[in-house]
């Protein structure tokens, strides 16, 4: 019998969020507050340790209050996680809505 996967779409508004706020938004959005460690390793695990398809829309990503290094680290993690899940994870960085 083939495996059936569910699909989850998560929308997070990143306007003005600092690094810890981005971690908190993911933890709350994916219901992982009880164990999430507020670091890049925990975020990677949260995104990749799943059976379902996941699409994350990060609204106002460019308006998050992140340093260049923090933004680069998040984006590299998103790319690595999406690559590991081979099509089951999509993260869309949405700068603005009109």
Where are these regions (language model features)?
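Positively charged, polar, low-complexity stretches
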Residues: 1-98
């Amino acid at each position: 019998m083939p495996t059936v996967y569910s699909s989850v779409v998560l929308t997070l508004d990143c306007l003005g969020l600092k690094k810890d706020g981005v971690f908190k938004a993911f933890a709350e959005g994916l219901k992982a507050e009880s164990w999430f460690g507020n670091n890049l390793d925990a975020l990677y695990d949260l995104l990749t340790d799943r059976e379902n398809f996941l699409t994350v829309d990060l609204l106002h990503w460019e308006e998050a209050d992140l340093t260049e290094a923090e933004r680069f680290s998040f984006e590299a993690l998103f790319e690595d996680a999406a690559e590991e899940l081979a099509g089951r994870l999509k993260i869309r960085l949405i700068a603005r809505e009109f």
